């Protein structure tokens, strides 16, 4: 599952990594969490960019889920391009059936388009649920099927 962080403030007065969600971004992420609660029964692993806005998006979503999810905050997701993110996903343990990745555009949008051959755009707060059969290490562009997509 790929998640683009929800709408963030345009200027934090500090670093880009410190930008927080706007009030509407928080509400959007909570709405997405409610939408996901009816579609997911578990998540084996969750990765989020260490940027504040991505972490806040994950937290707002996780609060609405009916199961606990522990997140791994990853610095490498902040600057990752689509090739980099695909390589990281390929390194996921095969015991992970459901992987949640919260990140940034253009990376999330491009990876979703590569994996599913569906280039629909990826607005702030959007979520794509993809299915893939096989070991993570074998995941290549065009191998996944987009089964659900929502925009808050």
Question: Where is each model-derived feature located?
Answer:
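Short, surface-exposed amphipathic charged segments that create phosphate/polyanion-binding patches used
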Residues: 86-92
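Short, flexible active-site-adjacent loop segments at beta-strand->alpha-helix junctions, enriched
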Residues: 6-7, 52, 77, 105-107, ...
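A glycine-rich beta-strand to alpha-helix segment
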Residues: 96-114
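Domain-level recognition of soluble alpha/beta enzyme cores
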Residues: 118-152
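Active-site-proximal alpha-helix that buttresses catalytic centers in soluble enzyme cores
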Residues: 1-76, 80-84, 119-122
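Glycine-rich phosphate-binding loop signature in dinucleotide/nucleotide-binding domains
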Residues: 39-42, 92-97
């Amino acid at each position: 599952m790929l998640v683009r962080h929800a709408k963030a403030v345009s200027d934090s007065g500090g670093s880009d990594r410190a930008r927080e969600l706007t009030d509407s971004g928080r509400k959007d992420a909570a709405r997405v969490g409610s939408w996901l609660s009816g579609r997911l029964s578990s998540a084996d692993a969750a990765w989020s960019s260490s940027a504040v806005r991505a972490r806040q998006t994950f937290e707002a979503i996780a609060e609405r889920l009916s199961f606990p999810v522990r997140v791994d905050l990853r610095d490498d997701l902040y600057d990752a391009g689509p090739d980099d993110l695909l390589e990281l996903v390929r390194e996921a343990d095969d015991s992970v059936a459901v992987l949640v990745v919260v990140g940034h555009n253009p990376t999330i949008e491009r990876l979703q388009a590569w994996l599913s051959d569906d280039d629909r755009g990826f607005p702030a707060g959007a979520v794509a649920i993809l299915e893939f059969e096989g070991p993570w290490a074998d995941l290549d562009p065009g191998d996944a099927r987009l089964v659900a997509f929502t925009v808050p």
